[in-house]
Amino acid sequence: MKMKRWLASAVLPFVFLAAAAEATPHVPLHVYEWVQSSARANYFFNKRVTHYGLTAEGVLNPRVLIVPTLQTYDDVAIADVVAKRRWRGESLAGYDDLVGEAEYLRIDLAAGTSTLERADDLDSTWSSITTTFPKNVTVIKDLPEKSLERKFLEAVLAYERGHRMEIAAQTKKTLTTDDLKRMEEHEREDLTASLLGGSAQASEEKAQKDHGAKADRKGGK
């Protein structure tokens, strides 16, 4: 499925202001959860599309979390991506309109791992310029505590812990008795809390505080 179609189906209106060199993409916070910003990029995940896995029988598997993510770049980050592709001898077609990257993560809560299933470089129409399937597996607890990736994944996990039934409803329109039983077991196991190192509540509170602060800034408060 093309990235443009996926974004459109989820009704994700992005608005660009001013010229490309100076434009700052507006990401709707009712769809995307802002996690953090570095010097060169902003990091979000799509809370409206995040969902659990399914077993071969179609039963909810809350031990697996599927998370679409988004990074938006500034001009320096864009130039860096282009320079690296040029150095590697890769095609630059479409990269004059690069604005960011979408990734699809598969988080295995039982194993404590995150797998990068797919990555799409995006242009200003949110179409995919290039798609890759890295399949890189990261052990979450092995990441440095202050790394951007660790902080991002912990924010996703904290969100999952506070929005489980909402995520379940996004996975299946109608939850069966078996689905609800799996969710009850998931609540009892609380694998997410163990991955957060016992600081799940603090992480969630921080994520909510950061989200509120970002919303206030967007609203001009």
Regions found by a protein language model. Name each.
Residues M1-A10:
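Bacterial N-terminal signal peptides that target proteins for export
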Residues R5, V15, A23-T24:
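Generic ordered-secondary-structure signal
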Residues S9-A18:
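Bacterial N-terminal signal peptides
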Residues A23-E103, D108-K221:
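N-terminal secretory-pathway/extracellular module detecting exported/lumenal segments
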